[in-house]
């Protein structure tokens, strides 16, 4: 049986802040399963590793015997979360929100235990709420309090517009906790204002206020900015295993430890500390630690056999040894007249633009089947198949087909 101290150690791993820790201890002491909530607005069709920081923490609560609520903000998604934004977000259509929500449902059970998960939509209660009810909810907070939020304060100070509906978002998110009778709510550090709103509203409606647990925002592949699709520094959980492995192996050595802390189930805190000491002493190469993390992530989102195949393919390319045929085949559609090499590199996702492709070619940083190529105007047509490599770690096994 897990003790309260052991539970708190697992819950606290990677956590930025717990409000209030004494209340969490008291609720754990009752022995009753807690209702642990995290909300996700379906603003894009796929989840990435940044989203899984919260999902991983939810999974840990499940391992301790608690019930988690994966809340899909199909209603709030149409408002648009203003947290951390310097301009009003464009609301999504109902159709976009529902389409994205369906993909979320398919993806979350790669991490969460289906038996201990409630999937809920906040349109369940907001779809029934009248205009009068919404006005009553709005009366629970003041404009002055809203302007204490850093993002709103900055926009107000710089005379950037703040739409009235953006003030509603924290209230609506907070009311979700009332509707779900949440004991704990998880969120990123940028969500703290909204999470605390839930505590206040629960007290107003006669409920015990939820414990707030904030998680750090995961740095993306660049090791600097928050992981984001718009920045291109992300790993999607639906990506091919070879992409998960390749991208993970590209991250900086310092970022590896951060990712282990927030993303790994297999490497305990004690083992991570030991591995760090071995790397510092030169006993262990940091690449081996990174490879272990890459294997774990590829296995989690695919399976062990697929992960090993991806690692073998990655190893074959970076060392020039082994069977590159183990790499998954990526089809690229080309016109009947073919595609110039610079365009091919871009179409295969190996460079962000033709100009960048041309620059890489001039640097002699491009290989096809192990041979350096330099001519950006070289034409490739249907039927070509080969391994194209840009730099040391960016590669793809490509087959050209006509549309």
UniProtKB/Swiss-Prot annotation:
Single biological process term from Gene Ontology: tyrosyl-tRNA aminoacylation
EC number: 6.1.1.1
Residue span(s) of domain S4 RNA-binding: 339-400
UniProt catalytic activity: tRNA(Tyr) + L-tyrosine + ATP = L-tyrosyl-tRNA(Tyr) + AMP + diphosphate + H(+)
Gene Ontology molecular function, alphabetical: ATP binding; RNA binding; tyrosine-tRNA ligase activity
Ligase among keywords: yes
Superkingdom to which the source organism belongs: Bacteria
Subcellular locations according to the entry: Cytoplasm
GO cellular component assignments: cytosol
Locus of motif 'KMSKS' region: 226-230
Binding site for ATP: 229
Main EC class the enzyme belongs to: ligase
Keywords annotated in UniProt: Aminoacyl-tRNA synthetase, ATP-binding, Cytoplasm, Ligase, Nucleotide-binding, Protein biosynthesis, RNA-binding
Locus of motif 'HIGH' region: 42-51
Record's function text: Catalyzes the attachment of tyrosine to tRNA(Tyr) in a two-step reaction: tyrosine is first activated by ATP to form Tyr-AMP and then transferred to the acceptor end of tRNA(Tyr).
Family membership: Belongs to the class-I aminoacyl-tRNA synthetase family. TyrS type 2 subfamily.
Subunit record text: Homodimer.
NCBIfam families: tyrS
HAMAP family in the record: Tyr_tRNA_synth_type2
Protein name: Tyrosine--tRNA ligase
């Amino acid at each position: 049986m897990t003790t309260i101290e052991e539970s708190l150690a697992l819950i606290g791993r990677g956590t930025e802040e717990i409000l209030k820790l004494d209340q969490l201890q008291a609720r754990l002491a009752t022995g009753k399963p807690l209702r642990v909530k995290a909300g996700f607005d379906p603003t894009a069709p796929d989840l990435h590793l940044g989203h899984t920081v919260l999902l991983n923490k939810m999974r840990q609560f499940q391992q301790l015997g608690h019930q988690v609520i994966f809340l899909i903000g199909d209603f709030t998604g149409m408002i648009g979360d203003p947290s951390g934004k310097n301009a009003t977000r464009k609301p999504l259509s109902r159709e976009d929100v529902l389409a994205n929500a369906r993909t979320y449902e398919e993806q979350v059970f790669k991490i969460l235990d289906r038996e201990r998960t409630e999937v809920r939509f906040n349109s369940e209660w907001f779809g029934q709420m009248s205009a009068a009810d919404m006005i009553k909810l709005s009366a629970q907070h003041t404009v002055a309090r809203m302007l204490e939020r850093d993002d709103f304060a900055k926009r107000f100070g710089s005379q950037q517009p703040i739409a009235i509906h953006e003030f509603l978002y924290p209230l609506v998110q907070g009311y979700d906790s009332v509707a779900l009778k949440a004991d704990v709510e998880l969120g990123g550090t940028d969500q703290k204002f909204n999470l605390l709103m839930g505590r206040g509203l629960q007290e107003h409606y006669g409920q015990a206020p939820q414990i707030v647990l904030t998680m750090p925002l995961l740095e993306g592949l660049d090791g600097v900015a928050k992981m984001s699709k718009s920045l291109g520094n992300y790993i999607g959980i639906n990506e091919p295993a070879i992409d998960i492995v390749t991208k993970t192996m590209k991250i900086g050595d310092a970022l590896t430890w951060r990712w282990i802390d927030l993303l790994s189930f297999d490497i305990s805190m004690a083992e991570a500390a030991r591995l760090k000491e071995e790397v510092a002493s030169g006993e262990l190469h940091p690449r081996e630690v990174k490879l272990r993390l890459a294997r774990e992530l590829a296995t989690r989102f695919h399976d062990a056999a697929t992960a090993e195949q991806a690692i073998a393919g990655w190893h074959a390319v970076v060392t020039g040894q082994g069977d590159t045929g183990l790499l998954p085949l990526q089809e690229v559609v080309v016109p009947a007249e073919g595609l110039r090499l610079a365009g091919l590199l871009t179409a295969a996702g190996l460079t962000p633009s033709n100009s960048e492709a041309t620059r890489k070619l001039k640097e002699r940083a491009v290989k096809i089947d192990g041979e350096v190529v330099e001519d950006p105007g070289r034409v490739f047509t249907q039927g070509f198949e080969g391994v194209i490599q840009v730099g040391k770690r960016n590669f793809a096994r490509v087959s050209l087909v006509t549309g």
